[in-house]
Each structure stands twice: as C-alpha cells, then as structure tokens.
Amino acid sequence: MGKKRGTGLGRSLQRQRGSERRGASSWLHASEVVGESGPERRSAVEQSPLEEFLATAELAGTRFVAERLNIQFVSAQSRTGLLTAQEAQHVRQLHEENRQFLRIPRRPYWDRTTSSEDLKQAERESFLEWRRQLAHLEEEKKLILTPFERNLEFWRQLWRVIERSDIVVQIVDARNPLLFRCQDLESYVKEVSNDKENMILINKADLLSEEQRAAWAQFFEKEGVKVVFWSALAECRRLSGEVKELDADSVADDLSDSEEESSSQEEDVTAEDSAESTSTGSALQTENQCLLSDDDSSDEYEDCEDEEEDDWQTCSEDEGGDKVNAIAPKSMENRTDIVSMHHVVQEQNRNVKNFSHLVQRNELLEIFKTLHSGPRVKDGEVNVGLVGYPNVGKSSTINTILGDKKVSVSATPGRTKHFQTLYVEPGLCLCDCPGLVMPSFVSTKAEMICSGILPIDQMRDHVPPISLVCQHIPRNILEATYGINIIRPREDEDPDRKPTAEELLTAYGYMRGFMTAHGQPDQPRSARYVLKDYVSGKLLYCHPPPGIDPDGFQHQHERCPESRTVQASGPVKPKKNTKAKQIENVVDKSFFHQENVRALMKGVRATMGYRPGSGLVSVPAPSAGSVVGKPWKKHGNRNKKEKVRRITKHLEN
C-alpha cells in the first residue's frame, strides 16, 4: 500500500484566493501594449487596398460586427434580373417625381452683339452644368438613364434646327412612343418661339392594330399634342408597287400595239405596210415621250444617287447665325396666297381630334403645309425640322417623302455630322437633324436592349433581356414562331407560368443546332437571334398608354398562332399537338419510361463454355446472333466515352 496523503486543505484555500483576486477590479492595464518593435512601428509607404481600408476604418473608429441569422429568401424572379411588381411600382413613382429634372441642354441667350467666342464659351458652360445635373440625378436618386448624346456639337445642330424650323416633328417608334418622346423638347420649342408648332410622327404604325392606334390617338389628344400615324417602309412598298404597275401597263400597251402592227402587215400591201409601220413607230415614240413627261410631272424625285451634295437645295449660315441664306429652286413660287387659302383648313385641323388611320405621302405633306398658321421664319416657305432617335426610321421617312435615297440609313448615331435642308417642293423644306439620343428614364438595362437603344451584339448578360421577352411574348406565340416545343412546367408549378430564359434558349438552340463544344445548347448565341427578332418586330409587343392593361392591349397575340405556317405552306390543316397542354411530371415519366427498366451486369459473361472459377461447363449451341467473341478480350470498353446528350436522349421526349 502506498503512503497516505493529506487532505490538501491549504491548496484549496490558495486556489480560492487566486480566483477572487483575478475577478476583482485592478488598476493594471487590461489591453495589450504593443512594443516598440511591434507592427505599428513599421513604415507604411505602400498598402494594399484591404490594408488601406482597414487602416482608415481603424482611424475613424469604425467597428465591424458579424451579422448572424440574416436570412433573405431570393425568389426565382429576382434571379432573372427583372423587377418585382412592388419594385416596378416604386421605380415608376420615382420617374414621375423626377420628371421635371429630365431636361435637354438649352442654348444660352445671344443676339447680334454677341461674339462667336463668347457664345461658344457660354454654350460650353451651360452644357457642363447640364451634365452635372444629370450625374447628380443618377447618383443621388439612384435612377437609370438611357445613354444620351455627350457631344456638344450635335446639340448645337439641334439648336439651329429648332431656330430655323416652323414645325418641329419628333419621330418615335409606335411600339413604345413614350420612351422615344421628349416632353422637354416640346417645351424648349415653345421657349424659343411661341409661333412654332410641335408634332409627333409615330413611325412603324403598321405594327399596331386599329384599336391600338385609336387608344394612342386619344391619349395624345388629352395631352394636347398633334400625332400622325405613319409607316415609312409600308409607304415605300406601296409607292414602288404603283411604279411597277405603271411599268407593267406600259409594257402591255407596247405589246398590244406590236400585235396590231403585225396583223396589219399581213392584211395590207407591202408599200402600205412600210408607211403604216413608219407612222406607228413615230406614234409610239410620241407616246413614250408623253409617258416620260407625265412621269416627270407626277414624280419630281427621280433616282439621283450620282448627284453631288452641292446639287441639293441646302441652307447655309454665317458665323453669327442671324441670317439664313437659302438656295431655293428657280421654279419656287410665292406661297402667300396658298397659305391664306389653307388658313381655314388649319383652324379645322386644330378642332378635329387625332385620327388613327395610316397616312400616305400626299396626306403627310398636306399636314406639313397646313399645320402652321403663325408668322414663319422665312416668308413664303414652311420649314419642317425632323428630330428623332436612331433606329426609329427618321432617315427612311425622309427618303420616302423625297422619293429618293437622299439620306444614308443607319442605326448608329453620328452618321449625319451637320444638319441639311432638303426641298420637297417649292415652299416646303425638310430640315434633317443628326440623330440624337436624348436622356430618358428606364427601369433596367434589359429594357434598353429590348428597345434597341443598346447594341445587342455587345451585351454581356443575356438572361435579363430574354426574361423580359418571355414576360412579354406568350408561350404559344414563341412556339408557333420558331416551331419549337418549350418544356412544360412541373407538377408542383403553375401550369400557366411564363417560360424561363433557359427553357426558351435551350429549345431554340436544339432546333437551330447552336451547340457548344460540350454538346450543350449555346444560349448566348441563341439569345442574340431572339433579341434581334424582338427588336425588328417579328416578336411583336406593343406598350399601351398609361392606364390600360398591357395584357388586354396585345390584340396581335389573340390571333391564330398557326397563321404563319398556313401562309407559308398553303391551306394545310395543322396537326393537333397533344403534348401542348400536358404538364410534365418528371418523377412519373422517369418511373414508367420503358427504356429505364434494364439490368446491369459487370464482369465476364459465360460464353463459349467459360465461366470464371468453374471451368468448362456445358452450354447450348449459340445462335449466330448470340456469339459475342472471346471472353478474355476487353470488348466492354467500346462506346465507353459517350456524350451526355446521347445517353440522356430518352429524357427529351
């Protein structure tokens, strides 16, 4: 047995006294004192961004506390880059509250005594202040503005066009007129002169139905703005069709005359024959000359692409800008009497409501002549200034009105460096302004891409704009347009939900054959094709006026989706798609699929009488189709590397 130990009462008392001493207050320092050789004695000439941030926070006395149980559920809609209903309502409210700050730059006051250098300096200062206001609006209010023109020279061209024009026409896209309309431009026109008139020309109006055009006409009527619905491409096709019909009629007349001439040659004598043919030839020549003269009188704008720019009727200005020298045509007449004749028509147009039908070229020119009633910038002449975004059809409108390609058509702003004036007829002059991108409010960048403001080929994230397309275009329209079958919603999802961007692009990529190197659908490439179809109008969505339900405004979505296939292949009865209304149940489909019921075995099979570990066994005579080969050969490695798409092909049905 060992030695008997004591009770250890003294040690327990010492431990108790030590614990009381540690818990009591003390005058000693409780914080760590950094020695002279510590890290704070080091020279800090260069610091990393993290070290600089931590040092600044330490000097400012900022403390960082870890946040726990900060759980936030992310909905499926937020992953698409789109706004929820509450967020969209909040953004629209902010847009309305800050609408008055969305202005265009003003030209400073000037007169005959203002020198050129003083005017340019004042313009630069005013433009710089305008840029600062927009930057403050984006930073402080957290609003998204469309890309706008930042070159002062283009705004100078706009100022000159407004000063020289009697009527300022804004050309907007019919699918979203409010996005391309600048209300502050209308206010600035009235600030320059109260005698000037504003008008909105809604281009691409053939994409709208009669009910949709009537709704927009009523909305702008309440706003007190004159609107005209116009389609440059449709009118150009109509005019070219009329020219072709005239050419066909002239060719038919020539053929009929030649047939009559040949029949007369068979009946008459040879001498009379020659005389009649000579007279007929002269008659044909005279008729052709009359036909050419009629064409020249009816259409004054023959194809003159080879003409130089100096041949156009252009206006030039001096350095001060107080004189307007125009090279008018020689045949220009005084329009004072004609203006007095149309004075009554102008008063009637002011009282008549906005009409909703598509106007033709002659009707549009008549509106230009009769809209302005006050004193004009130049006596006996109506100057119409055309202003608009790029890619809204401004150049196409000018070319259709003139009947010739006078202006280059381009979707890139900056093609036209200087404004130019083009005479349509004596007394009516079009003043073409360079394409300007004016500041406007948008909710997301996806909206700018779908509106054609941002280039599609330069986008980096394709999911938000494609998700916006899926929200606007119904599932059946997408399937009928591209001939695809988009995957159905699952059993636990809403059967009427919109397709996602991944579902649409996957189906489109499989159909077009746009695949990546790994055998998967190329979604970014497919997204560019779909977005270009949306911008061009193949996938049509029209924004309604404020206060109208967007879903009930889409009359074109109510049409039969098989109409395109019927027009392309004739009146063939389309096959009924039995899977269109089925809901995909992945569990049931995988369970009851017969291709999934299979048995797998690993190892060498008992063939040719060999079985591992049992030696030679009696095997019935194999048939010709069951002979596999030598069991010791590793033929099982064949087709080992299979593509995932080929293996899971049965899951796509």
From Swiss-Prot:
Binding site for GTP: 203-206, 388-395, 432-435
Highest taxon, organism lineage: Eukaryota
Catalytic activity: GTP + H2O = GDP + phosphate + H(+)
Listed GO CC annotations: Cajal body; cytosol; endoplasmic reticulum
Intracellular or extracellular location(s): Cytoplasm; Endoplasmic reticulum; Nucleus, Cajal body
Biased composition (Acidic residues): 248-275, 293-320
Pfam (any one): MMR_HSR1
Enzyme class: hydrolase
Region entry Disordered, spans: 1-47, 248-323, 621-653
Keyword Ribosomal protein: no
CDD domains membership: HSR1_MMR1
One GO process term, biological-process aspect: ribosomal subunit export from nucleus
CP-type G domain boundaries: 155-439
GO MF annotation terms: GTP binding; GTPase activity
Annotated coiled-coil segments of the chain: none
UniProt biased composition (Basic residues): 631-653
EC numbers, comma separated: 3.6.5.-
Keyword terms: Cytoplasm, Endoplasmic reticulum, GTP-binding, Hydrolase, Nucleotide-binding, Nucleus, Protein transport, Transport
KW Transport (keyword) present: yes
Recorded family membership: Belongs to the TRAFAC class YlqF/YawG GTPase family. LSG1 subfamily.
Function: GTPase required for the XPO1/CRM1-mediated nuclear export of the 60S ribosomal subunit. Probably acts by mediating the release of NMD3 from the 60S ribosomal subunit after export into the cytoplasm.
Domain notes: In contrast to other GTP-binding proteins, this family is characterized by a circular permutation of the GTPase motifs described by a G4-G1-G3 pattern.
Protein name: Large subunit GTPase 1 homolog
Source organism: Gallus gallus (Chicken)
Lineage: Eukaryota, Metazoa, Chordata, Craniata, Vertebrata
Name of encoding gene: LSG1
